[in-house]
Structures are given as C-alpha cells and as structure tokens.
C-alpha cells in the first residue's frame, strides 16, 4: 500500500489544489495519504486560522493531518516523511511567495531520501 504525503502551504488556493491531488493520487494507488502542516511558536493568528482550514479540508478529503513544529521547513518535512514511511511527497511551487518557497522545494528534492517528490506549480494544468 502506497503512502502519499503533502506539505500544506499557507496559500489557500495552492493548499486546496494539493489536497485534491494528494487525495486523488492516494485513491489511484489504493493507499493512504497524510497532510503535514509545519508551524512554529510565532505563527500569527491569521496564519494559524489558515492552517486549521487547510487541515479541515484535508480531513474532509480522507487525509490524516500532522501538525508539527519546525523552524526549518525542509528538514522537518524530510523527517516527517521518513517517520511516516511516505512513498510520494507532494510539494507546491507557486510563483507567489509563501513559506514553502523554491528554496525549500529544492532542498527537499536534492536531499538524500527514500521517497519520490512531486512538485506542483500554480500554472494551468495541461
């Protein structure tokens, strides 16, 4: 059984797209999927509210949600994906600035890991 993980960003539109894709991929693979919400102690109230909305969306779509603290998003994602035995990790790479900037995506992609990474852009789907 395959395990799909998705890192939920602060951007609501991107988070929704990633949830839809993670749920669909897990269903096609007859597997489970989990959503990771990376927080830190200084998370302002509006960002915390967004994180909760994204988590609720993930749960409504059949995902399990992990809220985790971590200042280094890439390292935290790598550790969580390994711990949860993720086979495929989905990350967003939109043009807009958000917490999972290209630097984070590049660091995860280049890291030594035991899972595949799928990077989803915010452009139109082909």
How does the language model describe each region?
Residues 109-126:
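Short, flexible loop segments at boundaries between secondary-structure elements
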